[in-house]
Amino acid sequence: SLRRQRQMCIRDRHYYTLLFDKEEDMDLVGDTSLTSVQVEWIFVKTRMMKKYYFERIKGAWILEAINLRPIERDENEDFVEFFGHFATDSLFQSQRVREPLAFVTTDPDDDFSVLETTLDLNQWFAFKPALPAERLSNINYGQRNDDGSPTKILALKGIGNGFSNILYFRRKAGEWELYKFEDVSI
């Protein structure tokens, strides 16, 4: 059941992930006028996506359908396959982190402002969050999530703990690279 899967996610890791193709789409999170959302599980190793379709009917969210599909392949490097490798192989990861890496974080002297700076590769390995390797979750609020998109944003959001990391990826010469990292945890 969805509840059991969600509880498993919460128990295994105290955060969930969201995927976006572009920054503007991140504004859709929390839109109270929405009447439909999809909750997605992306299974990295099997390259499958399980999607739960919910509709808001008379104020209540109702599960309308469940769909399971393979993730499309094209001539470019597939993001899910890339991310599975990136999350589990530090040597591969070191080849796919742009140097210098753009870094945004909260100002330690002022919680209400952010610092924009850069990290070198060693600093990335010191600051990086634990990355999900088995599966990604996604709540689709209406944002595009195109398998062929040249950019992907992976948000890791804590459940009741203030954790917030955002990883920005883009395709460069057909290969994915991490080019920006945000840690705005509180």
Which residue stretches match the model-derived regions?
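Short beta-strand edge/turn micro-motifs at domain boundaries
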Residues: 38-74, 162-186
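Short amphipathic beta-strand and strand-loop transition segments with alternating hydrophobic
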Residues: 15-29, 138-144
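Short, hydrophobic/aromatic-rich segments at coil-to-beta transitions
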Residues: 30-40, 147-156
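Short, small-residue-biased leader/transition segments that mark boundaries at the very start
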Residues: 3-10
